């Protein structure tokens, strides 16, 4: 479980371990509706975009990035309206964005049925 396709963490043998347009559920699905992935984790892709604390910017090692050299652009800056990263895709989209390597950006003022969040804790 783990390859270079970018999809290995949620697409099981039947390809439908994520809630997206071709995943067999016509709208947001209940928590745990789909089988867990190979790591035993549920609902890691699809259903709703999930807000991340990281602000959106070029990847840290991208040429021309203000964070070139490896500094991760985490958390808000003095401008709280800067776009933040969202990940995971949402139920009405295709599987192209339902992969761990894809990230999206949205303004924190935006709120609708396609956006959610996941509570996490550092161990």
Model regions and ranges:
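Surface-exposed recognition segments
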Residues: 4-5, 9, 13-29, 44-123
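Short, small/polar residue-rich loop motifs at catalytic or cofactor-binding pockets
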Residues: 34-37
């Amino acid at each position: 479980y783990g390859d270079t396709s970018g999809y290995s963490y949620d697409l099981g043998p039947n390809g439908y371990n994520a809630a997206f347009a071709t995943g067999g559920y016509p709208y947001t699905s209940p928590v745990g509706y789909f089988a867990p992935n190979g790591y035993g984790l549920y609902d890691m892709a699809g259903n709703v975009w999930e807000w991340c604390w990281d602000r959106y910017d070029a990847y840290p090692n991208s040429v021309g990035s203000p964070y070139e050299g490896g500094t991760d652009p985490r958390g808000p800056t003095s401008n709280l309206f800067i776009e933040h990263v969202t990940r995971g895709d949402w139920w009405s989209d295709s599987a192209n964005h339902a992969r761990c390597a894809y990230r999206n950006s949205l303004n924190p003022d935006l709120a609708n049925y396609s956006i959610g969040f996941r509570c996490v804790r550092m161990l």
